[in-house]
Structure formats: structure tokens, C-alpha cells
Amino acid sequence: MSEKDRSNSRLPLHINIRTEIFKTKTNSLRKIWQNSFYLPHILKFLKINAKFKRQILFGILFIVFWICIYGISHFSNVEESPPQEMIPHEVDMLLNAFPTEGDGKATAILLNWSRIENLKTIVKHLCQYTMFKEIMIWNNNGDVHLSDQIFSEIRCRKLRYYNSPGNMHFIARYMACAMATTPYCYFQDDDWIIRHMRSMYANFLRYPDLIHTDTNADVYSLTNWKWCFFDDSIDLHACFSWVGTGAFVSKENVINFLKMTSITEMDPTEFAYGDMYFTTFMNQVPYQLENELQELPQENAFSAGEGRLRNKIFMHKALLHIYDHLTNRTGVFETKELYPTIYQRDVRSPCENDRCLFLTNKNSFPDVRTFRYKPSINISESERIHESYFGTEHFIKYPYSHAVDGKNWTVWKSSEVINKDDYIGLDLLFPMPFPLTFTLVVDHHRDYFSTLNIHISYNGMDWIQLAPLPKIIITQLSQTGLDGKTHLLSCSFRIRETGIRFVKLTSTREWEFPYGIHEFSFHAKPMN
């Protein structure tokens, strides 16, 4: 990719500086003397015994003199410290800085059947995010009437309800989105807490025509390998992805999907189970992020037990619909593969603190076009074929998210060695108004750092190579890597350019070892 110089535009910055009022130090001896219990009695004695005044005065001065000498020698280095909480600490300048692009442009859609307590937890979590104008709960349970009284302790003004006269199952979330007043919608089920909302939304805003979903490593290996279906001869390029573990979608795509359900003459049961059709009918690979999910109570889960087989049956029916229309060139489904295609993408996982996204060009699975889709092969058989060709155990054990999960003892390990022009990096979600310090903990040879190019970007497309390179400080840690012998290295460097959003570290040569990234993080704490 060509490198284009761009001016270093800076955003307007408002800094609120909190000042603390410190008490003026008081001489300790003087303070003790003034507050002494004996002072009034001494003065009274001097007044009554005036004739002894001179002798007593000299005596007191003599005693005070030696007390001062003693105090100077013992307390000259002691200062009265302010209370512990008033001592200034090193504060990250980004502590309360968050992306604001797209604020108020999304509606969160939740479905209710029986887990009211879960919904309360989810609503409280979602209400804090500024991207949501409203949080809509579609109630499929006719025996329950949702109202403000049920959610009174949440105190979320964004909350809205629709009490459906009947159970519309999963198609209800798409109908609710079509009713929304915002251009984007967010879906999730009632048995998860999705912790990386800002990260997923920031990437979605870059490519809003693509469905963005969130899942764990196990399911990621399905939705990016075993559940991908390609046939270039008819322009089939679809992958199935769950939306229940978090998904941002455009309202336009949802409305198009509802139109497709009518044109393809889906039967009422298929219509009710719309989740099994939505991502496939887009005929685009969803942009999926991988991370560790946080579960809520999941009794009677829809996809447990026999539900898994039922889901695969509907997944297969969705593929038969789209395959038939693409084969006959009916024009119902999109045939152009949108940018970025699956192999043009490099955003992999959200950082644990929801302040960045991990980037790398290294894919974890073979080319999805290795197998041409055949309607006669069902989903379970397709899974077996893919697994026999390439197992996913390595990725599930060492997934992308381990590079940015805040834990030095976990690791993302690439399945292949580092090649020339391979890179890792971070999307910082919005242009940074401060200089930043980056830290890497890796299981690499020390020479790796001497063959890096560091690039920065404002938009993720036009890159600027830093020259000269910033000073890289490398420290050997006591912790060892996966072999139990090689010590991990901690590398830190500072980028003083401001207004940047993307950073990547590119290898200028091939190495005989794979990526082993234990941690990749950044902060905006001032340098000492």
C-alpha cells in the first residue's frame, strides 16, 4: 500500500485540571507550645512571682534553647505530609476520554421471554453507552406486561417496550429494528453481557454495510471456517454468524432482509427463526471480532441440546434459498463482495479495556474457497469435512484475543512463522490528542525489534512510516514462554505524534518463529 503524507491535524482539546488546597506547614514546636496545657499556669506563676521573674525567664530560655538544638538535630528532615489521598498520582490522560463518533445513531434491540432479571442487568449495562438513542425491549411473552415499574431501579430514560400480542420468536428483533428511528441497530440475546461495545461500534462505523458480530474463539472457528460457504461460479460468498452474542447492523440491511423473506417465500416457521437466515441472506462474510464472552444465567437456552441440530437444519434451508436464487440469477441477493473482503480485513479482537482493537494480517484458517459449496452436503457433514482438512484446536487454545486481554500468562500464537511484511497493530478507536507509550510482551528473539518498521495512520488506509524510529526499550522478564526456557521480553516505545488512530509494527524480514504476543497495550501517562 502506498504511503501518503498527511498533515498532522489536531482535535480541539479541553483539559479540566483539578487543584488541591494544601495546608500551610506549621512549626511543630511552636504549635505544641501554643496548645500546651501548661502555658496558662506558667504565665500565672510568673505574674504572681514577679521577683523571681528574671531568674525563671533565664531558666526557661535555657531549656527552650536545648529543646531547639535537639529538635533541629532530630527533626530537620521531617515534613508534614498531606493526606495520602491528596498526593498527586500519575494519571492516564485518556482515563475519561471515549470515542463520540456515531453517538445517538443506534437503537439496542432486546427480546424478552422469561429472563427479566437478566434483562435488568443488560439494560443497566447498555444504558451507559452514548451510541444508543433508545433501548427497545420486544416482549414475546403474552403472560408478562413490561412497564417502567418493572425496571424502575434501573433509571434508564432510553428504555422503551413493545408488548407483542403473540410470540414472534427471533424475527421480532428485525421487526423492531425496522421500527427504529436510528440508522443502526444493535442485537443481543438475554444471556450475555457484551463488554466491548465501543470497540465493536468503532469498527462498524468504518464499514456499516457489513454486519459486525462478536463471539468467542470456539464459535469464531466455526463462523470463519466451517460455516463459510463459497461458490465463485454463482457469486456465493456467505458465512453464517450468530447475532445473539452482540451484533451491529444497518437498518437498511434489516429492511432488505425482511423483503427477502417475502420474495423467497419462506414458510412461517422459517420466518420465525430469522436469526438462522439473516447473515447468510446478506451474502457477505460478517465482520467478526473474537474475545472472551461473559455469560448470564442460561437455563433452557435456545441453542442447547436438540436446539443445535434444529439450528443447523434452518441454516441449511437458508443456503438452499440463496443458492437457488443465485443459480437462476434472479437478482434478489447481492452478488458483489463488499470491501473489505474476508482477506482484506485485519481487525481481530477488542482490547480487554474496550479502548482498542488488535490488528494483524495473519489469518488463522485456510482459504474458505478451499471447498466449493454443494447443496447436497448438510451443515454437520460440512463441519466434519473442514475439521478433517484443518483442525481448529491451535486457534482455540491461542486465539487473537490473548494478545490484548490484559494477562501476561496468555498468548496469541500464530499458526505460521512471521514473514516479511507481516504486521501487528492497534486501532485506538479515535484520534489520540496525546503522545502515547506502547508496551509489548512477546515470546520473540530480541533481534525481532531491530528489524521493525513502525507506521502510523489517521484513517487506517494512508500510512506514514516513522523515521527515525522511536527509542525502543527492551527488558527481559523472569517469566518464560511456552517452551518453559525462553524468557519473555517487554518492549516499550513512545510515539509523540498526536491525532493518530492506527499504529502497526511491520517485520522487514522473515523469521523462523511465529508471533507469540502475550500483551499489547498503550497509555497516555506523562513521562517522568
Task: Name these PLM-found stretches.
Residues 101, 124-134:
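Short, acidic, metal-binding catalytic loop of nucleotide-sugar glycosyltransferases
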Residues 118, 162-172, 271:
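A short, glycine-/small-residue-rich helix N-cap motif at loop->alpha-helix starts
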Residues 157, 177-178, 192-268:
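Conserved catalytic core of nucleotide-sugar-dependent glycosyltransferases
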Residues 174-184:
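Active-site nucleotide-sugar/metal-binding loop of Leloir-type enzymes
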